[in-house]
Amino acid sequence: MKLVKCGKIVVASLCMMATLAGAAMPALAISPAGCTSLAQIEEMNDDEEAQVQALKAAIAKVNVKYDEVAQSWEFDSPIYDKAEKNKTCCLSPWIYIFDGRSEVYFDEDFSYNGNSEIPLDTLYIRAGDYLYTYECDPDYTDYAYDTDKKVWWALSNFEMEPSEIDWLRNVLGEKKIITRYYGAGAQYDYTWTADDRQAVTDMVNLYDLLVTASPEVRARALRG
């Protein structure tokens, strides 16, 4: 996985069936189990030690790599390796930060493994009344046939803006989440498992904790 600032083309559409029927808009989704709420994070802001311990607990759930040359940290979900091993699909977020800087970068990798060739150009996430559409940038999308595993694979990367991470919070509050991989008239629908949901929850939780922590607090959690 390359540590780069990736380009993206993302379109969000929020389908509200209740609204079309004249009903009120549904409330925003509740935080899933195991996810630290934003209110809880705000309460910890005055207690640096609590922030450090919360960060350590969140970091322990993901993969961590440090680049001494770039002085950067990369965090990614174990779900990607699991999906590759099982020849299945996943949405795998990854995060990177730089020593001494406040910015937190959040990317999403959509990975497909299956029997059909799908040169990805569009991805959809359906969860309840929410429908989010991702238009793949050819520069950050690829596909091929793996002769060793005997499966077709495809991958598309998106760099997400802070407001767009709310899309994940929204879908995590729904009972069923489906990702549709589409391209050149071919498509495949993948229903998220409990492991998929937990993996994304863990990464969103880590992102929220990193955003609210100072570079000094992050350093204590990562190097302490």
Labelled PLM ranges:
Residues 18-31:
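C-terminal segment of classical bacterial N-terminal signal peptides
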